[in-house]
Amino acid sequence: MTNPLQVSELVQYVKRELENDSLLQQVQVVGEVSNFKRHSSGHLYFTLKDEQSRMKAVMFARDASRVKTDIRDGARVIITARISVYVASGEMQLYVERMMEDGVGALYEAYVQLKEDVEARGWFEAEQKLPLPAFPQKIGIVTSPKGAALHDIATTLRRRYPQAAIVFAPVLVQGKEAAPQIVRAIEWMNEHQACDVMIIGRGGGSIEELWAFNEMPVVTAIHQSRIPIVSAVGHETDFTIADFVADVRAATPTAAAELVTPEAAELAKRLNELNRRLTRHYAQYITERKDQVQRLATSYGLKSPRVLLGLKQERLDRAEMGLNRIGKQVLQSKQQALTDQVNRFARIAMQERLAEQGRQLVRTRKQLERIHTVLRTKQDRLHQMIARLDSVSPTQVMLRGYTYVEQDGRLVRSVTELSDQTFRVQFHDGSILAKREDEEDGNRTIL
């Protein structure tokens, strides 16, 4: 006869056998909760029973913190647990790792499995996401025609960005036919390039009601879409696989509409600021050119000789008037263009309009540069003509040693024109008085 076992030895033996059985280390059990207690430490203690048996169960605080449902006596739950023995009492006990209400358990397990599979494919990664367009012209909506989500999205779009066209694809958002309809709507939007960005969503609901957005065909269609997609499924606390795969996740349908649209009032404010800056720029440019023309008009080179001043002053005046006229025309043209763009704001994307403004600014700047080049050429020619006139002016000739004679205010061109009276000899730096004296041989000498 073998030696009898101590009670503790037997309990330890049973404990080891249970813990060495891999099947019993992760088993799913369904039953009704009774004797439920939540300890101050966060641990949960309860009994799991059915009509024939019952077992004690414990769920430690770390695992209990992940339970999203309200557990209470009488609740029917599905648990994932390991089986062991509580040595002090020798009782077999369930050590619970996960727990959910029965009825959603299978769906939740499927959700977790699909989420892990899709995440492993890299579909959640940021580099897989498409950027949202800054100024969409067409916005697609895929949702139920009867739900509040459509009203919330459409109302927000019309308020914030009324110039965008709305392309609506009505679908079921729950039930067996929901997923195929959602897939077809996404594919249709892509095939026809029907919109620049797409909102897919519905209002809140249970996991069963939101399940269409956890099905693989819908998830795949979202991932393969060439059009950026904003997911707006349920409320802020609801998450579906579609939310993780979509390019952007919005907490609510209203938030989705705000994400895909700029604020029209802010855009108008920015446009007005650009208009003011453009007007200020051209006004400053015209003022600088006018000052330059004034400096040229009052320069020494244009004052002497007077004949040249008269000719060139007229040309400069015309050039100044032409520059002013062109400047005013440019400003009026740009102001009118900006006004026209504001009026066409409902039809043209802001980004394209700003780009066209930039191109118009470049063209105008080149035109003003050409005007500046013409003025500079005219100024160079003016200086050349002044130099040529100076080279033949009397002052320049006298600097080379020549003089001229005046008598009684008249210019004397021949010695025969001189009388016996005094006359004036003009040098470049002054004049002297002289008198004629005739020699006996008939020659005339100036004294």
UniProtKB/Swiss-Prot annotation:
It holds the Pfam family tRNA_anti_2. Signal peptide: none annotated. InterPro entries: Exonuc_VII_L, Exonuc_VII_lsu_C, OB-fold_nuc-bd_dom. It is an enzyme of class 3 (hydrolase). GO terms for cellular component: cytoplasm; exodeoxyribonuclease VII complex. It is found in: Cytoplasm. Its EC number is 3.1.11.6. One of its GO terms (molecular function) is exodeoxyribonuclease VII activity. The keyword Membrane does not apply. It catalyses: Exonucleolytic cleavage in either 5'- to 3'- or 3'- to 5'-direction to yield nucleoside 5'-phosphates. Keywords: Cytoplasm, Exonuclease, Hydrolase, Nuclease. One of its GO terms (biological process) is DNA catabolic process. The keyword Nuclease applies. Bidirectionally degrades single-stranded DNA into large acid-insoluble oligonucleotides, which are then degraded further into small acid-soluble oligonucleotides. Belongs to the XseA family. Heterooligomer composed of large and small subunits. NCBIfam families: xseA (TIGR00237). This is Exodeoxyribonuclease 7 large subunit. The lineage of its organism: Bacteria, Bacillati, Bacillota, Bacilli, Bacillales. The gene is xseA.
